[in-house]
Amino acid sequence: MDVKQHVFVAMSGGVDSAVAVAKLLEQGYAVTGIHMQTWKDPKWQAVIEDLPAPEELAETTANALGIPFVLLDIREAFYQSVVQKFLHEYLSGRTPNPCLFCNPQVKWGILQAYALAQGANYFATGHYARIEQLSSGKVRLLRGVDRFKDQSYVLSLLSQSQLSHS
């Protein structure tokens, strides 16, 4: 009996990550959903109180797809790695893209590391991008098939190690 490859998928509660899960399940992978809790500010609670929390959406989606779900509270790491850098850059007169901080340091830095420590073979998201395994053993990041939806630019700072487990 073949052992299934295990993939942890970062789930936002949106369509893209749900489709990624569904495609991986169709291909025969064992899948676990993972969501990172990044922000909870009481000042905004009154504004968004009628909206479901992103972690609730992600867990509901995981349950509907019949996969295990993990919620990681990474608020402090997110604040240090993303929010503070964003504010520093913004106050220095630049307009940063927070995804460029978040993806290598948080999504792949924390979530992927957690997934691999739990025995996962791979870590996936719903980003529109592709990777290619080269004969040299390196991995190359490629644009998404639909160039109008391409998100490879926000993954451009991922390391070879991070890409190789994606």
Segments and roles (model prediction):
Residues M1-L157:
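ATP-dependent adenylation/nucleotidyltransferase module used to activate substrates
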Residues L157-S166:
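Internal nucleotide-binding/catalytic subdomain
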